[in-house]
Amino acid sequence: MIPYGKQSISEEDINEVVKVLRSDFITQGPLVPKFEKKISNYTGARYCVAVNSATSALHIACLALDLGIGDYLWTSPNSFVASANCALYCGAKVDFVDIDESTFNISISELEKKLEVAKAENKLPKIVVPVHFSGASCEMERIFELSKIYGFKVLEDASHAVGADYKSTKVGSCQFSDMAVFSFHPVKIITTAEGGVVLTNNQNFAEKMRTLRSHGITKDSESFVADFSGPWKYEQQDLGFNYRLTDIQACLGISQLKRLDEFVAKRRDLARKYSDEFRDVSGIEIPSTDFLETSSWHLYVIRVKSSAKREPLFNYLRNQGIGVNVHYIPIHLQPFYKNLGFKKGDFPSSEDYYE
């Protein structure tokens, strides 16, 4: 079976992990900050905070942006549920913005219309989470412009887009956002087994997230509230979590990062070949070639024009040993979100894309 997604682990990756297993620190050692620094250098963002998953990254990013009860977070229905769940973890409400029918990312025109309505109703979002579906960046410059007009923060869910480009920057630079999140799950571009990071250019956000990922505890004496002495001193200043990444995972990430550009180049080459081969095949639609050289191509999505033929094709390919998958069932159509009041017909472009 050709899997839907699979990590690429080299002998160098294995050797680096073995070195850490033989070292003094397998967690809370020097390699997590080293990994963070390398990701910062790659993307151009000033700060990077590594955690145990992209879901955790979205959660602490929302908390650092003070999302809470009474607030709204907007995101795309065409994503994994974590893009929306992060709002609910904070006690906030979630809503969605329908997608563009050619890019399958958040529709700028739908966002503009929804913001005007929300302004009139005094229900503007505190955070908007654009999702870079399949590895192609949303129109971040325009979204960032809208954030200045309407007063919301921008948190990029770039889980699919490690190594992707946008205009003259790397996705994750946060040139047009307040924060960006990467995923290092094994099916993504590079892996740390499980893991994720938050990138930002705001020092206060970074410091807040570093505290939140480790139980809300700080050992920075300059930030202590109480007047205690002793080199053993630490303070819990917030209600945090155990979202730490281990040194074992960080060293794998450091090793994988050396091949990131190679991985992305190979994915772009495959996307180019797929597009050439499938362009004249009847009954299907292939992805837009507008972002052929900028997407990281986490996914190459073929749309079957007849929904009645999708499942037979899916089963046929699986039976031929090709591990295809379907992305995504719109979040608002999940039973949990239907119980929150969402229903079929709320976001027709996302529903049409899925169907």
Model-derived regions, located:
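Short aromatic/hydrophobic contact patches that present stacked aromatics
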Residues: P3, I127, V181, V197, ...
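Active-site PLP attachment segment
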Residues: Q175-K219, D247
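N-terminal "arm"/small-domain region of PLP-dependent enzymes with the aminotransferase-like
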Residues: M1-F25, P30, Y234-Q237
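PLP-dependent aminotransferase-like
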Residues: L63-I149, K153-A158, D165
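Phosphate-binding glycine-rich loop
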Residues: F25-Y72, C86-C90, F96-D98, A120
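Conserved active-site segment immediately N-terminal to the catalytic lysine
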Residues: E156, H160-T191, W232-Q236
